[in-house]
């Protein structure tokens, strides 16, 4: 079993302290996603707004217990985000910043693109969308149909994206598109909003309301050549193979959110059902052990990706297990409070609704299982 050392324990303590500010707005976000503006000046929101999640000279740092952190390691990220998610994952997702787009820009952007992009985040609270998922093919890069067509000295972007976090709030984003068939024909471009031909609408949801999911329609949106990420790189380093390194770093962070939701549900039962029959207590203990098992898997995944960003098999396994864990544990915990549990215990009901969303963040479980199975086959191991 992996135990957090003193340094990571200090980070966990600071995250738990900061998470208290999210508790004041979490329930309100369920009714009004714009309630996030009330907490933008809290330490946690200020930090999330400018975090880069990658080694950089201007990465903001936080201190705790005499240690300094910049969240440039995946292990630090999973420790930090799990604690925040225990309080309210919707509030975490409502934060300004570029938790997914930022690492991609750091990887593929040239110096001018990186400076321009991160200057936007430093200037004011800025929400950034990450538009990959499409209505017909989900997040399957091979089925991507959004087009980036040459147009004079630049390009025109045409297509539709769906289930894009923070899209209605964003004034900046990354869109994935295709310039030609095949894996080497995929590109990621920087887009500003509003823009002619760009339409963004909010999608109704019953869980993760703070994430403000949206649909994006692009009709010949003008894209300057200097907004195409990876233009200075060879084709093999700017397409989907490079994106995989970013996805591998993001998946343990998403898994940490699912684990945080499951932890919160178990802790809720322990607080509100102090007297349990032996069989019921055994079931709760089994749920808690399952949470810890997936947590250990995710910590191992984070260390593996930190060691080799191309090694994503554990990251995919952890993300799939955490998504199932969040759903199973929250539903099981509702059973401790009878038929009216969702009405009588709205916080637990919210956890159950939010848990459903983890499945669809950063690739559904069938995608993650394919990644794991392909890795096993490639390594010559039986499945």
PLM region descriptions:
Residues 49-51, 123-132:
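A short, Trp-centered hydrophobic/proline-enriched beta-strand micro-motif
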Residues 160-199:
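A short core secondary-structure module
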Residues 1-92, 379-383:
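Amphipathic, small/basic residue-rich leader segments at the start of a protein or domain
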Residues 337-383:
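Glycine-rich phosphate/cofactor-binding loops in nucleotide/flavin-utilizing enzymes
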Residues 107-128:
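FAD-binding glycine-rich core of flavoenzymes that anchor FAD
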Residues 2, 202-292:
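Glycine-rich beta->alpha junctions and the first turn(s) of the following alpha-helix
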């Amino acid at each position: 079993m992996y135990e957090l050392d003193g340094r990571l324990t200090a980070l966990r303590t600071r995250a738990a302290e900061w998470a208290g500010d999210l508790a004041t707005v979490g329930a309100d976000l369920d009714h009004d996603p714009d309630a996030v503006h009330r907490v933008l000046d809290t330490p946690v929101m200020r930090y999330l707004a400018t975090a880069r999640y990658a080694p950089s000279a201007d990465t903001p740092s936080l201190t705790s217990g005499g240690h300094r952190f910049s969240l440039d390691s995946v292990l630090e990220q999973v420790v930090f985000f799990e604690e925040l998610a225990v309080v309210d994952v919707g509030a975490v997702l409502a934060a300004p910043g570029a938790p997914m787009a930022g690492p991609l820009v750091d990887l593929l952007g040239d110096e001018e693109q990186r400076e321009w992009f991160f200057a936007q985040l430093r200037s004011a609270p800025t929400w950034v969308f990450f538009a990959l998922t499409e209505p017909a093919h989900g997040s399957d890069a091979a089925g991507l149909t959004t087009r980036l067509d040459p147009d004079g000295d630049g390009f025109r972007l045409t297509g539709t994206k769906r289930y894009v976090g923070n899209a209605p709030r964003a004034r900046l984003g990354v869109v994935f598109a295709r310039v030609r068939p095949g894996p080497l024909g995929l590109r990621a471009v920087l887009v500003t909003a509003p823009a002619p031909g760009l339409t963004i609408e909010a999608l109704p949801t019953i869980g993760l309301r703070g994430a403000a999911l949206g649909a994006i329609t692009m009709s010949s949106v003008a894209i300057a050549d200097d907004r195409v990420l990876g233009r200075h790189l060879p084709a093999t380093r700017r397409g989907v193979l490079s994106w995989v390194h970013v996805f591998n770093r993001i998946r343990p962070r998403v898994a940490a959110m699912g684990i945080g939701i499951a932890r919160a549900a178990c802790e809720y039962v322990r607080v509100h059902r102090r007297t349990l029959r032996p069989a019921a207590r055994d079931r709760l203990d089994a749920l808690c052990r399952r949470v810890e098992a997936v947590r250990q898997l995710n910590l191992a995944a984070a260390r593996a990706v930190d060691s080799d960003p191309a090694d994503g098999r554990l990251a995919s396994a952890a993300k799939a297990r955490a998504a199932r864990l969040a759903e199973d544990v929250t539903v099981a915990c509702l059973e401790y409070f009878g038929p009216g549990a969702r009405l009588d215990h709205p916080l637990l009901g919210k956890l159950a609704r939010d848990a459903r969303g983890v499945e669809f963040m950063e690739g559904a479980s069938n995608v993650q299982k394919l990644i794991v199975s392909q890795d096993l086959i490639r390594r010559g191991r039986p499945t």
